């Protein structure tokens, strides 16, 4: 979506393909991109590279996952999205922050994005022609120094939010638990009140349940 937005802004025509191999009537493209999240997609990525040897491939599912969109387009933080390639999608999505305070061995976020920093306000993410429903893709919402400002924006703007990537429950404290309980949080479809968390390491059971109990005590079921 970011690449599509940037290319359209340059006057380019963009096609979204869902298969790695061209069809019989596929046109010739000036540039081809591919993205892989998981390692088990490597055979599919290889098919893409066989079909388009000059394809630019990124994502955490390939060996060299350090390639970023910003490097490809020669810009800094680029937080613009082309929703036209998913016309059925009616919400707004984006990041208010990048990076993470944790350094889990299995995760590339701290290696790729560094320490937490703010990149957008809630108002930056919202599409004014849509309902006030925001899917937040933040990996560590409370890791950014400006999280209190983001909370005020949610409340003052009467937004509903879905913290799609979950909350770092291991880093929850009484203040953040109380704040979460006061927010209109929902599942990714905005049909059910739901807060996502992750339990990535069984050895951290005590830390996990300490955070979970703080959420429960704050009124989050």
Name each model feature, range by range:
Residues 24, 41-43, 63-67, 102-103, ...:
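Short catalytic/ligand-binding loop motif for oxyanion handling, primarily in non-cytosolic enzymes
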Residues 55-82:
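Ser/Thr/Gly-rich flexible loops in soluble cytosolic domains mediating phosphotransfer, phosphorylation
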Residues 1-57, 62-64:
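A short, structured N-terminal alpha-helical element that caps or precedes a catalytic domain
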Residues 1, 6, 87-129:
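Canonical Radical SAM [4Fe-4S] cluster-binding loop centered on the CxxxCxxC motif
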Residues 10-12, 26-30, 50-56, 70-71, ...:
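Short glycine/proline-enriched coil/turn segments at helix->beta-strand junctions
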Residues 3-4, 44-51, 67-72, 149-154, ...:
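Short, aromatic/basic amphipathic alpha-helical patches
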Residues 15-18, 54-59, 93-95, 135-138, ...:
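A structural signal for short, well-ordered beta-strand segments and their strand-loop junctions
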Residues 33-37, 108-211, 215, 221:
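Core AdoMet radical
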């Amino acid at each position: 979506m970011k690449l599509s937005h940037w290319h359209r802004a340059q006057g380019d025509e963009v096609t979204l393909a869902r298969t790695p191999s061209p069809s019989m009537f596929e046109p010739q493209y000036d540039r081809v991109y591919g993205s892989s999240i998981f390692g088990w997609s490597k055979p599919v990525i290889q098919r893409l590279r066989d079909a388009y040897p000059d394809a630019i491939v990124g994502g955490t599912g390939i060996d060299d996952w350090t390639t970023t969109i910003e490097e490809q387009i020669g810009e800094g933080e680029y937080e613009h999205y082309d929703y036209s390639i998913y016309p059925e999608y009616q919400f707004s999505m984006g990041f208010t922050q990048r990076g993470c305070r944790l350094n889990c061995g299995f995760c590339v976020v701290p290696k790729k994005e560094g320490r937490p920093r703010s990149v957008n306000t809630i108002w930056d993410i919202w599409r004014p022609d849509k309902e006030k429903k925001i899917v937040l893709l933040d990996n560590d919402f409370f890791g950014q120094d400006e999280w209190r400002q983001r909370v005020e924006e949610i409340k003052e703007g009467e937004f509903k939010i879905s913290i799609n990537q979950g909350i770092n429950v291991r880093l929850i404290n009484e203040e953040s638990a109380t704040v979460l309980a006061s927010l209109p949080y929902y599942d990714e479809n905005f049909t059910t009140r739901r807060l996502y968390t992750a339990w990535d390491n069984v050895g951290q059971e005590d830390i996990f349940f300490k955070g979970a109990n703080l959420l429960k005590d704050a009124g989050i079921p």
